[in-house]
Amino acid sequence: MALKMGYATLRWRQPDLSKALPALKKAGWDGWEGRLPLDWLGPPKRLKKVCEDAEMPLCVFTASGSPEDRDWEHVERNKRRMDYAAEMGVDCFMFMSGRKPEGRAMERTDIERAAEGAEQWAEYAAQYGLELSYHIHTNLLVDSAADWTLYMSLLDKAKLCIDVSHAELWDYDPVQSLVDFWDQLNYVHLQDYASCTVRDPGQYNPKWVSVGEAECLDFTAVLKTLEDRNFTRWVTACPGEPAYEGEDAVSEAERSAGMRDYLRRLGY
């Protein structure tokens, strides 16, 4: 079974998608994860045409901010992003947890409130048959293996995106995490780092690199686990540092071919 391989366009700001998406296709990717503002993307009809022309589907769309923020305007803006994601037919709508509380230690009630917000978003998305996917990430509210386990125990409709590098940073074996959270898993991120000199909550400092450049974890084992378990959802690779502000999206897409070649050498 061939895994579906996507590219995370997290560094794109004002890309010419009519040129950048064909470059991703040429680099060998099957789809792309989008994070751009709606006013840049334009109507779904327009974006669908651009994607179809490039044979490069939008596989995942992301939130702007986190669901624990209950401000009415913030929630409404993200509902519009969910509306858009549903009309585009994406596989899932990804979000992360928010920042840690200021001036005090985090408490269990903070995680409970965060999970409650995620479930409210998931309930809204469910009208479209759209799934939410919580992306684990260091230095945010949920910031340890224990926090992660607690948070997932509080979710029902909202599902999970495991970024295997962040699992590894929390000293949670990436392969084991896939197995342990399999029933909630609907998306996977691949990311690589060359070093991390501080491994304390809120202070992790990984030096991100393109997947395969440092091999901070056993990517072959991760991908084989997904293949052996017949994972049918998307697996998306993330670019590394330096941040690509100033580099046009086409150049970045062309350069991403090196990362795609690495994954092919692993058999994927």
Sequence positions of predicted segments:
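Acidic-and-aromatic substrate-binding clefts and catalytic sites of carbohydrate-active enzymes
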Residues: 10-16, 34-46, 65-75, 101-105, ...
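Active-site acidic/histidine proton-transfer and metal-coordination neighborhood
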Residues: 18, 70-160, 254
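Histidine-acidic metal/acid-base catalytic patches
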Residues: 1-28, 145-149, 153-158, 168-268
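A short helix->loop->beta-strand "cap" motif at the edges of active sites that frequently abuts
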Residues: 56, 90-91, 130, 229-233
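Catalytic-core regions built around general acid/base machinery
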Residues: 46-53, 117-125, 177, 222-225
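Short, histidine-centered active-site or binding-site loop motifs used for metal coordination
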Residues: 62-65, 97-99, 205, 239-241
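Conserved beta-strand positions in the central sheet of alpha/beta enzyme cores
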Residues: 33, 60, 94, 133, ...
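N-terminal pre-domain/capping segments
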Residues: 1-91, 126, 159, 183, ...
